[in-house]
Swiss-Prot record:
Keywords tagged on the record: Cytoplasm, FAD, Flavoprotein, NAD, tRNA processing
PANTHER family per UniProt: GLUCOSE INHIBITED DIVISION PROTEIN A, PROTEIN MTO1 HOMOLOG, MITOCHONDRIAL
Family (UniProt): Belongs to the MnmG family.
Annotated Gene3D superfamilies: FAD/NAD(P)-binding domain (3.50.50.60), GidA associated domain, C-terminal subdomain (1.10.150.570), tRNA uridine 5-carboxymethylaminomethyl modification enzyme MnmG/GidA (1.10.10.1800)
InterPro entries linked: FAD/NAD-bd_sf, GIDA_C_N, MnmG, MnmG-rel, MnmG-rel_CS, MnmG_C, MnmG_C_subdom, MnmG_C_subdom_sf
HAMAP family: MnmG_GidA
Gene name as annotated: mnmG
GO cellular component term, pick one: cytosol
GO biological process: tRNA methylation; tRNA wobble uridine modification
Protein name in UniProt: tRNA uridine 5-carboxymethylaminomethyl modification enzyme MnmG
Cofactor: FAD
Positions of NAD(+) binding: 273-287
Length: 631
């Protein structure tokens, strides 16, 4: 049976990628259908109850700057907020929020249900409708056909999902949910490169059975940060304490005793796990000389006693899990409410995608989230937003848009995946970005919101708030540039008390703010500066003053590299014609098909010398072609 309404975009999956994809498409005015196997699990946090962290909060802010939901939902559901790397430079500072699972999920669902142009429908998808090599719809498990101009697939861990606890395993997309096996089989018939990855989760613990008095308390920051540019501290629910405890030598002995029944060490699991979030058995095996590993004990919510012991993800047999947990300080009488487990699932080589996240082999089909080999809610949400907006633009007959590496961490994420691929779950870090001083958490709106408005992603409320901030920055910068402090005045004496060497000639306030001893607050106090602006404007003034030289230098580097970054490589380019390229380089370039010289240069094994040869070849043939046309 065919559904009566045709949609512009269909999104399969209601996780973090799927919800951002559906919302982005609908915000752009395109009729959008979100299909999920269970409406009650929309926006569910399947693993840890937290959003943000190093590199990840940068993605959340970028999603937010483009009108996405993750940041706002975090402010409404966050029960502890902390700024990580607060004493380091602004490029690596990151906000992390502990979230109440139910409050977060409710915020996402409310956003979905109130979004114009968006329809929700509860049905699992078993098949794709393909006509003339193009994806034009989907078929649900009850045979209902939905047709569309574009389809975004965000299946998470559900494609061929297998859950492992010890040597026992069963099919599942996550605990309590069936996998999408029919769809997984259908996708394996298509010309995509498919492999397996693994992720895991720790056992959950009943807080009533835990002795918190022997653990280290970890409270959130005060004053409280916010995650969204539109966020307000008043939106935050009650704030709670997290705790820290540690494994010990006894814990590690218990874990080692279960290695012979571990699916990881007996070859039962083939998939590769996340390097930066290893299981506790992997850590014990990899670091045999380490007697202790830190565990963050995180509340799951305000209305539950369940705890998430971050740091002991495991797929060991349940009896080993229970013994290991009870050997940990504070957990001696712990009751496990849900066992930890590992899950194996299908993912598809992201090198088979375009930068728009549309698949190369099937027009109209987009992939986003863990299906592309990433791990993390934030990475999924960022891909979902990009896939959703480009699916909508395809429906509108418009060209795709993807941010460059120097514009956004979203650009870094997508370019890394497509240029280099991944053989393990990919996680974002600030170290992955060459231009991280320009791609800060605090300026994602200044980088992206204007473009988001142009794309149709940003609504009036966000646009007004952005303009107020931008205008405030311009006004304050002008004021600081034109307010002078002259030697031997009361203002100069007040400033001299804060700095090592006294002022010998006049300075404007912006130049004074470049000095490491001075902050906006103590400088404004010293010169009795009235009518101080919003804290976000003050933050920008300090960063732009103190890091001006570094920021200008990075901007110059970007400008120099822009030529290579934008030099297009023809789709059917014959790399065999370029003399001097090694067979390895020819093979990699022919396989990956980079779109630009800049992208080609980031492929492992493609040397700067090879890029120079390509550049010379392109210039030579461009001139030959031009001469032939003139003749």
């Amino acid at each position: 049976m065919d559904f009566s309404q045709r949609f512009g975009v269909i999104v399969i999956g209601g996780g973090h990628a799927g919800t951002e994809a559906a919302l982005a498409s609908a915000r752009m005015g395109v009729s959008t259908l979100l299909l999920t196997h269970n409406i009650e699990t929309l926006g569910q946090m399947s693993c840890n109850p937290a959003i943000g962290g190093i590199g990840k909060s940068h993605l959340v802010r970028e999603i937010d700057a483009l009108g996405g939901a993750m940041g706002r939902a975090t402010d409404k559901g966050g029960i502890q907020f902390r700024v990580l790397n607060a004493r380091k430079g602004p490029a690596v500072r990151a906000t992390r929020a502990q979230a109440d699972r139910e409050l977060y999920k409710a915020a996402i669902r409310g956003t979905l249900e109130n979004q114009p142009n968006l329809t929700l429908f509860q049905q699992a998808v078993d098949d794709l409708v393909v006509e003339n090599g193009r994806c034009v719809g989907v078929v649900t498990n009850m045979g209902l056909r939905f047709m569309a101009d574009a389809v975004v697939l965000t299946a998470g861990t559900f494609l061929g999902g297998v859950i492992h606890i010890g040597l026992d395993n069963h099919q599942g997309g996550r605990a309590g949910d069936q996998p999408s096996n029919a769809l997984a089989c259908r996708l394996r018939e298509l010309p995509f490169r498919v492999d397996r990855l693994k992720t895991g989760t720790p056992p959950r613990i009943d807080g009533k059975s835990v002795d918190f008095s022997v653990m280290e308390e970890q409270w959130g920051d005060n004053p409280l940060p916010v995650m969204s540019y539109l966020g307000k501290v008043e939106e935050h629910p009650q704030q709670v304490c997290c705790y820290i405890t540690h494994t010990n030598a006894q814990t590690h002995d218990i874990i080692r005793s279960g290695f012979d029944r571990s699916p990881m060490f007996t070859g039962v699991i083939d998939g590769v796990g996340p390097r930066y979030c290893p299981s506790i058995e992997d850590k014990v095996n990899r670091y045999p000389d380490k007697d202790s590993h830190q565990i963050f004990v995180e509340p799951e919510g305000l209305n539950t006693h369940e705890l998430y012991p971050n740091g002991i993800s495991t797929s060991l047999p349940f009896d080993v899990q229970l013994q290991a947990v009870r050997s940990i300080r504070g957990f001696e009488n712990a009751h496990i409410t849900r066992p930890g487990y590992a899950i194996e699932y299908d993912y598809f080589n992201p090198q088979d995608l375009k930068h728009s996240l549309e698949t190369q082999h099937m027009p109209g089909l987009f992939f986003a989230g863990q299906i592309n080999g990433t791990t993390g809610y934030e990475e999924a949400g960022a891909q979902g937003l990009l896939a959703g907006l480009n699916a909508a633009r395809l429906s509108q007959g418009k060209d795709a848009w993807t941010p460059r590496r120097d514009e956004a961490y979203i650009g870094v994420l997508v370019d890394d995946l497509i240029t280099m691929g991944t053989q393990e779950p990919y996680r974002m870090f600030t170290s992955r970005a060459e231009y991280r001083l320009l791609l800060r958490e605090d300026n994602a709106d200044l980088r992206l919101t204007e473009k988001g408005r142009e794309l149709g992603l940003v609504g009036d409320e966000r646009w007004a708030a952005f303009n107020a901030k931008r205008d405030g920055m311009a006004s304050e910068e002008q004021r600081l540039k034109t307010t002078w402090v002259r030697p031997k005045t009361p203002e100069a004496e007040a400033v001299n008390a804060l700095i090592e060497k006294p002022l010998t000639h006049e300075y404007n306030l912006l130049d004074l703010l470049k000095r490491p001893e001075l902050t906006y607050a103590n400088l404004a106090e010293a010169v009795a500066l009235a009518d101080r602006p919003d804290s976000a404007v003050i933050e920008q003034m300090e960063i732009l003053a103190k890091y001006a030289g570094y920021i200008d230098r990075q901007a110059d580097e970007i400008e120099k590299l822009r030529a290579a970054e934008t030099t297009a490589l023809p789709v059917e380019f014959d790399y065999g014609q370029v003399k001097g390229l090694s067979n390895e380089v020819k093979q990699k370039l022919s396989e990956i098909r980079p779109q630009t010289l800049g992208q080609a240069g980031r492929i492992p094994g493609v040397t700067p010398a090879a890029i120079s040869l390509l550049m010379i070849y392109l210039k030579k043939h461009h001139h030959q072609k031009k001469a032939a046309q003139q003749a």
